[in-house]
């Protein structure tokens, strides 16, 4: 495999130019996503992940952007990946998906998708890693990251510009938020950001189910959201979920009716 053409700053600017709304909805896989009105999804740009796209397509909602960071989905539901990608305006995959894809799939990704890369493989801290990221964040002001000296500790971070990389943390939701922030949406609205119980997905997985590991990884995930809230002062983000593990002090709750009322008011003003 030759060198990988990662997403560039010019690519990000093109995505920003193609936006059709000031707000975006990140359409995730949690059960409460079904409560998000279709009328609302049709009025905002939608960033959809994994298998959630099928619900949107079934209801004539075309995603602005399809995001995939789990190679298992491509391996187990290859036809769905192609369908979701072709029916979304843009597709972003991460380096893991690209590297572990077949030669044919790599060719499709190269020609039709944008590729992002995580700053790290593992979230462990350590002296050398701390030095590395202290240097990196001086070079890239968009990278916010805290790395503990001990290898037993876990780092936390957030990147404001996906053209230089992103900070991963066991949930695609966090990656999607960094994508949305990079695209400079005025408001980021999460749908289906639940992370409760066994973390089930709302869509049918009767064929090629993918076991969810979110519940056991929750203790690794939550510190990233806390870091985000403390360090990204201009992040305007809300959660539509009324059953979530993310405290509303971190991502404030907003109702669909509040958003619909705004749309109605804008129409009559």
Swiss-Prot record:
> Which residue spans adopt a coiled-coil conformation according to this UniProt entry?
none
Record keywords? Cytoplasm, Lipopolysaccharide biosynthesis, Transferase
Q: Which InterPro entries match?
A: WaaZ_KDO_III (IPR031026)
What does it catalyze?
an alpha-Kdo-(2->4)-alpha-Kdo-(2->6)-lipid IVA + CMP-3-deoxy-beta-D-manno-octulosonate = an alpha-Kdo-(2->4)-alpha-Kdo-(2->4)-alpha-Kdo-(2->6)-lipid IVA + CMP + H(+)
Which top-level group of life is the source organism from? Bacteria
Signal peptide coordinates:
none
The Gene Ontology terms for molecular function here are:
transferase activity
Write out the annotated subcellular location: Cytoplasm
- Residue ranges annotated as transmembrane are none
Entry's Gene Ontology BP terms: lipopolysaccharide core region biosynthetic process
Its UniProt pathway annotation is: Bacterial outer membrane biogenesis; LPS core biosynthesis
User: GO CC terms on record?
Assistant: cytoplasm
**Enzyme Commission code(s) on record:** 2.4.99.15
Listed NCBIfam families = PRK09822.1 (NF007333), WaaZ_KDO_III (TIGR04437)
Entry function: Involved in the biosynthesis of the core oligosaccharide region of lipopolysaccharide (LPS). Required for the addition of 3-deoxy-D-manno-oct-2-ulosonic acid III (KdoIII) to the KdoII residue of the inner lipopolysaccharide core.
UniProt name for this protein: Probable 3-deoxy-manno-octulosonic acid transferase
Q: Which gene encodes it?
A: waaZ
């Amino acid at each position: 495999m030759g060198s990988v053409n990662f997403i560039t700053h010019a690519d990000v600017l093109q995505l920003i130019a193609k936006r059709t709304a000031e707000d975006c909805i990140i359409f995730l896989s949690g059960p409460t996503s079904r409560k998000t009105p279709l009328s609302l999804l049709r009025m905002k740009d939608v960033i959809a992940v994994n298998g959630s796209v099928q619900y949107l397509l079934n209801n004539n909602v075309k995603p602005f952007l399809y995001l995939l960071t789990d190679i298992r989905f491509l391996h187990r539901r290859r036809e769905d990946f192609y369908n979701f990608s072709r029916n979304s305006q843009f597709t972003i995959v991460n380096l893991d998906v690209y590297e572990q894809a077949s030669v044919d799939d790599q060719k499709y990704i190269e020609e039709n998708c944008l590729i992002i890369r995580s700053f790290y493989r593992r979230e462990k801290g350590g002296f050398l890693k701390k030095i590395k990221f202290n240097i990196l964040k001086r070079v890239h002001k968009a990278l916010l990251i805290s790395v503990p000296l001990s290898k037993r500790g876990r780092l936390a971070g957030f990147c404001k510009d996906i053209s230089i990389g992103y900070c991963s943390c066991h949930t695609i939701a966090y990656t999607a938020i960094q994508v949305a922030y990079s695209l400079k949406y005025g408001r980021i609205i999460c749908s289906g950001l639940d992370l409760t119980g066994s973390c089930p997905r709302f869509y049918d997985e009767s064929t090629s189910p993918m076991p969810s590991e979110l519940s056991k990884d929750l203790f690794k995930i939550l510190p990233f959201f806390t870091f985000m809230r403390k360090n990204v002062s201009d992040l305007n983000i809300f959660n539509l979920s009324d059953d979530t593990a993310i405290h509303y002090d971190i991502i404030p709750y907003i109702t669909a009716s509040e958003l619909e009322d705004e749309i109605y008011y804008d129409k009559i003003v």
